């Protein structure tokens, strides 16, 4: 089994067939809708909120609303769908969440996307929730996770998941790998590669993305969609407190299983950090799209499919050549 991560890989260019990178198409059909880029912000409180969710939907970007304000979910679905936009929510696996799904069915509220959002998604509770959703609201596109093995992907797909999230603890504010000894931190890209061999349905690569080039690498190794937290945090439009440290502006960014999110010091597998203010989120999205268009042009194609077949080399932890600050 080849083990590697994002910084160990360089993709090998093919002959370019476009005059300009602007000819390259970055769109992706994911579930019932088509999106501008194969990227989704992490469903975390310091990355996504209702205002941003609406802007993303209006502008043909995928989003997943977090699940940490449970009472707000039904009004959110109604507001989005009454505005002619798609609703994409998250659920957990506690008993109340099973009741919540039944309530949606009773009220004939059918979110276009439901993400079952659990740190260790290869579990009976997630399998039961997938089946529960598919029984009561079969028209919702169900994303389940997170997993780190082909067995996990297969079991969730067999239960009825329409897409699976791959990644156990590789994120910047996730400390699962340190607290538990388990996870895909340090080999997330290889885990994605292995999982893709078993997958029959789309995969979302979740965690460990540090550069825009990592998006192209994720697609090469089997992802249809790439979930990103830290690169989307700390923008003007981002949720989270802005603080000034040594004359510079920062925003807080914390993990979904951190004490800052939970409000208590119990079962903590996330940490909090301050990320330097990055300016406009719209500028970052535009730059991501342009960089991905460049990636496609280097792959010798005109759309995302061309990235899936490029050759690569493994250059252990050396692609930055010491260029890190």
Curated annotation (Swiss-Prot):
Gene3D superfamilies: Aldolase class I. One of its GO terms (cellular component) is GMP reductase complex. GO terms for molecular function: GMP reductase activity. Keywords: NADP, Oxidoreductase. NADP(+) binds at residues 203-226. PANTHER family: GMP REDUCTASE. This is GMP reductase.
């Amino acid at each position: 089994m080849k083990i590697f991560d994002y910084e160990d890989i360089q993709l090998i260019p093919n002959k370019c067939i476009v005059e300009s990178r602007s000819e390259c198409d970055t769109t992706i059909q994911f579930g019932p809708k088509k999106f501008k880029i194969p990227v989704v912000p992490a469903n975390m409180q310091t990355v996504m909120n209702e205002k941003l969710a609406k802007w993303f939907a209006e502008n043909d970007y995928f989003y997943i609303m977090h699940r940490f304000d449970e009472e707000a979910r039904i009004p959110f679905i109604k507001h989005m769908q009454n505005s002619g936009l798609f609703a994409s929510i998250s659920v957990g696996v506690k008993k109340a969440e099973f009741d919540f799904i039944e309530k949606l069915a009773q009220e004939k509220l059918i979110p276009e996307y439901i993400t079952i959002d659990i740190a260790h998604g290869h579990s009976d509770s997630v399998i039961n929730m997938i089946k529960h959703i598919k029984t009561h609201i079969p028209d919702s596109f169900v994303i389940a996770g997170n997993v780190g093995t082909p067995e996990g992907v297969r079991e969730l797909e067999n239960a009825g998941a329409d897409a699976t999230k791959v990644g156990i603890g590789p994120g910047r504010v996730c400390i699962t790998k340190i607290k538990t000894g388990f996870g895909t931190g340090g080999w997330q890209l290889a885990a994605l590669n292995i999982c893709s061999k078993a997958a029959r349905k789309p995969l979302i690569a979740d965690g460990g993305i540090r550069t825009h080039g990592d998006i192209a690498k994720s697609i090469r190794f089997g992802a249809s969609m790439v979930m990103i937290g830290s690169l989307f945090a700390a923008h003007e439009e981002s949720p989270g407190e802005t603080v000034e440290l040594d004359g510079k502006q920062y925003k807080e960014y914390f993990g979904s299983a951190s004490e800052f999110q939970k409000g208590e010091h119990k079962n903590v597998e996330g940490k909090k950090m301050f990320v330097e203010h990055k300016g406009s989120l719209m500028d970052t999205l535009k730059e991501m799209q342009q960089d991905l268009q460049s990636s496609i042009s280097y792959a010798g194609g005109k759309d995302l499919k061309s990235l899936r077949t490029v050759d690569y080399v493994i250059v252990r932890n050396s692609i930055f050549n010491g260029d890190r600050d």
